[in-house]
């Protein structure tokens, strides 16, 4: 048996599992963890529990620490910087006359990288935009093209049932939608 803790980084995002070591991490607490993208700030969604070896992808990255008030302030500052980065990127997209829709800006916790998520109908040559953004923000810039379902998950909205969209509130992964399913729900087939 291995002890793991489930951590989520964004609203309705996927839950990732980490080694809690000997930390006491209640549900809803904030933690600092080591990820493939670097050090990240997340929320405990599954408190520490034991699982069998084959249920977890090895090796488990560790939880570095429970977040401190300083970490919480850093995370809040990053959210404010993301709003400003979003506005700046929108202006640069218009300046370069690119046919893309910016969805979200995201700083890594340690400010080593700034990610921009966007949607577009086809492939976009955004090399000049990346150079422009790198000169403004003086950090590594990454642009990621996402699909319309991912866009909806990030932005949210209200479904035809009148409730908040499932993908924005609790679905962490998307199952394929068949033509039959769309017809049963009277959705357009495009």
Which stretches of residues belong to each language-model region?
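Acidic-enriched and Gly/Ser
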Residues: 1-189
């Amino acid at each position: 048996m291995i002890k793991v803790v489930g951590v989520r980084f964004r609203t309705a995002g996927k839950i990732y599992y980490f080694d809690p070591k000997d930390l006491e991490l209640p549900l809803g607490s904030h933690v600092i963890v080591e990820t493939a993208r670097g050090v990240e700030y997340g929320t405990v969604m599954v408190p520490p529990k034991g699982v069998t070896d084959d249920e977890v992808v090895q090796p488990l990255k560790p939880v570095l620490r429970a977040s401190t008030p300083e970490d919480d302030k850093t995370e809040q500052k990053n959210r404010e910087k993301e709003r400003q980065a979003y506005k700046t990127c929108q202006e640069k997209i218009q300046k370069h006359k690119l046919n893309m829709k910016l969805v979200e800006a995201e700083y890594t916790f340690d400010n080593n990288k700034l990610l921009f998520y966007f949607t577009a109908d086809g492939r976009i040559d955004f090399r000049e935009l990346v150079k422009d953004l790198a000169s403004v923000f003086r950090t590594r810039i990454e642009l990621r093209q996402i699909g319309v379902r991912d866009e909806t998950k990030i932005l949210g909205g209200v479904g035809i049932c009148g409730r908040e969209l499932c993908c924005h509130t609790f679905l962490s992964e998307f199952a394929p939608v068949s033509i039959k399913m769309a017809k049963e729900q009277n959705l357009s087939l495009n």
